[in-house]
C-alpha cells in the first residue's frame, strides 16, 4: 500500500520540479527582486561618516544608521517596507571605491536597488590630487557605473556633513552640486540640518578619540573601560568634565550615535517625500 502511494507522488513531483527549474532559468533577475522580496531597497555608499565603525565598536547592538533609517521609515505608517544596505567604508574615496574593486564586489551586483545615496568628498579632498578636477570626474564615472548596473535606481548625490571647516565643506559641496546639475540629478543636502543641530552643542554629535599616551597617568584607571588599542574612545560626553580641558580632546569630528541619528532622521524625511510622490503618481 505504501509503495503504491509513493510512485504517484514521485511522478507528480517530477514535472513540478522540472517546471520550477525552467522558471528559475527563464525568469529575469528582476522577478526575484532584491534581498528581501516586497521591500524597497536602499543602498548607502560613503566613507567613515556613513559607515560608523567606532560607534559600532562601542555599541555593537546599535541600532546604527541603516537600522534607524528603516525604523523611522516604518514609523511613518503609510510607506512600503524598506530595507537599507550600508556599504560604506572608512577612509574611502570614489577613486579607491572603483579601483580597489570594492564597488564590483559589494555594489555592482546588488539586486533590485530602488534608491542609492552617495556621500563622498571628505577623503577625496585629502587624498585625490588635483581635487577640484578629479573629484568631479570620479563622481561622473561612479554615476555612470551605477546607471549601468542599476538602471531602475534613483541616484541621490549628497552633500558632506560639517566635518572640515566651513570653507572646505563649501568647496566639496559646490562640486557635488555641479556634478549633480550636469547629471540632472537632485541633491540631498544634509549639511544644513547637521549644522543646525551642532548649534545646540558643538561637540554633542561627535565621539571622542584620544591617544592614551597624552592622557595624564593618574587618569589611566578611569579611562581603562574606554581603551581601544593605543587610544581612548568615548561615545559622547561622559568624560568631558574631567578630560575636556586636554588639547585636542574634541578634535575628532566623526559622528557618534547622536550624529548618525541626525543623518538618519533627515534621510528618512527626504526619502518619505520621494516615496509618497511615487505612490501618488500610480
Label for each model-derived stretch:
Residues 1-10:
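N-terminal secretory signal peptides that target proteins for export/translocation
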Residues 3, 35-37, 71, 75-80, ...:
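Alpha-helical cap/lid subdomain in secreted, periplasmic
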Residues 7, 25-27, 31, 234-235:
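Short, motif-level signal for alpha-helix interfacial/capping segments enriched in acidic residues
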Residues 8, 21-22, 144:
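Residue-level detector of alpha-helical transmembrane segments in integral membrane proteins
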Residues 13-28:
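Bacterial N-terminal signal peptides
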Residues 24-25, 31-88, 103-111:
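Serine-esterase "nucleophile elbow" of acetyl-processing enzymes
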Residues 51-63, 86-98, 126-133, 208:
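Acidic/histidine-rich helix-loop elements
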Amino acid at each position: 500500500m505504501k509503495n503504491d502511494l509513493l510512485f504517484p507522488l514521485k511522478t507528480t513531483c517530477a514535472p513540478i520540479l522540472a517546471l520550477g527549474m525552467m522558471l528559475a532559468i527563464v525568469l529575469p533577475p528582476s522577478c526575484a527582486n532584491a534581498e528581501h522580496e516586497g521591500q524597497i531597497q536602499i543602498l548607502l555608499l560613503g566613507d567613515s561618516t556613513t559607515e560608523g565603525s567606532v560607534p559600532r565598536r562601542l555599541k555593537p547592538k546599535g541600532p546604527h544608521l541603516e537600522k534607524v533609517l528603516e525604523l523611522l521609515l516604518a514609523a511613518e505608517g503609510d510607506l512600503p517596507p524598506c530595507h537599507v544596505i550600508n556599504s560604506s567604508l572608512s577612509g574611502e574615496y570614489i577613486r579607491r571605491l572603483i579601483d580597489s574593486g570594492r564597488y564590483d564586489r559589494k555594489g555592482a551586483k546588488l539586486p533590485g536597488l530602488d534608491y542609492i545615496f552617495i556621500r563622498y568628498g571628505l577623503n577625496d579632498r585629502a587624498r585625490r590630487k588635483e581635487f577640484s578636477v578629479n573629484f568631479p570626474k570620479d563622481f561622473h564615472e561612479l554615476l555612470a557605473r551605477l546607471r549601468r548596473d542599476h538602471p531602475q535606481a534613483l541616484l541621490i548625490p549628497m552633500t558632506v556633513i560639517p566635518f572640515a571647516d566651513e570653507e572646505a565643506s563649501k568647496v566639496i559641496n559646490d562640486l557635488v552640486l555641479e556634478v549633480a546639475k550636469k547629471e540632472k540629478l537632485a541633491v540631498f543636502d544634509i549639511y544644513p540640518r547637521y549644522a543646525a543641530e551642532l548649534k545646540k552643542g558643538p561637540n554633542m554629535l561627535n565621539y571622542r578619540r584620544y591617544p592614551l599616551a597624552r592622557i595624564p597617568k593618574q587618569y589611566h584607571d578611569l579611562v581603562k573601560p574606554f581603551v581601544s588599542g593605543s587610544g581612548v574612545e568615548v561615545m559622547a560626553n561622559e568624560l568631558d568634565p574631567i578630560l575636556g580641558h586636554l588639547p585636542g580632546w574634541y578634535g575628532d569630528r566623526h559622528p557618534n550615535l547622536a550624529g548618525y541619528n541626525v543623518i538618519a532622521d533627515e534621510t528618512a524625511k527626504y526619502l518619505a517625500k520621494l516615496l509618497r510622490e511615487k505612490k501618488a503618481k500610480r
